[in-house]
From Swiss-Prot:
Biological processes annotated in GO: regulation of neurotransmitter receptor activity; synaptic transmission, cholinergic
CDD domains (alphabetical): TFP_LU_ECD_LYNX1
Signal peptide: 1-20
Residue intervals of the UPAR/Ly6 domain: 21-105
Organismal lineage: Eukaryota, Metazoa, Chordata, Craniata, Vertebrata
Example of a GO MF term: acetylcholine receptor inhibitor activity
Annotated S-S bridges: 23-46, 26-33, 39-64, 68-85, 86-91
Superkingdom, natural source: Eukaryota
Subcellular location: Cell membrane; Cell projection, Dendrite; Endoplasmic reticulum
Protein name: Ly-6/neurotoxin-like protein 1
Length: 116
């Protein structure tokens, strides 16, 4: 019995401890926001969502989420939006993690079309 208990304790000590993910968590009307925060243990992703009200006015939201689905353009809502996800500490702090300018062209066209 003692060798089995010793083996169990050695195996238990060898397990890596789960570390919580650090993400920026904030909501800001403008280009970007930074507010580092330790996420709860069950969180697997840092998420950044940008909602475009007009081609020059947007809202940035950053959060900790347990699951994440990236989108380039969400055409189901009134305003265009993009969502990006990442899985390492403070990975959602980049200045502009959304798709490149060329990829934003359909969003801008849809926004302009909606204004007509």
């Amino acid at each position: 019995m003692t060798p089995l208990l010793t083996l169990f304790l050695v195996a238990l000590i060898g397990l890596p401890l789960a570390q919580a993910l650090d993400c920026h968590v904030c909501a800001y009307n403008g280009d970007n926001c930074f507010n580092p925060m330790r996420c709860p243990a069950m969180v697997a992703y840092c998420m950044t969502t940008r909602t475009y009200y007009t081609p020059t006015r947007m809202k940035v939201s950053k959060s900790c989420v347990p699951s994440c689905f990236e989108t380039v353009y969400d055409g189901y809502s009134k305003h265009a939006s993009t969502t990006s996800c990442c899985q390492y500490d403070l990975c959602n702090g980049a200045g502009f993690a959304a798709p490149a300018t060329l990829a934003l062209a359909p969003i801008l066209l849809a926004t302009l079309w909606g204004l007509l």
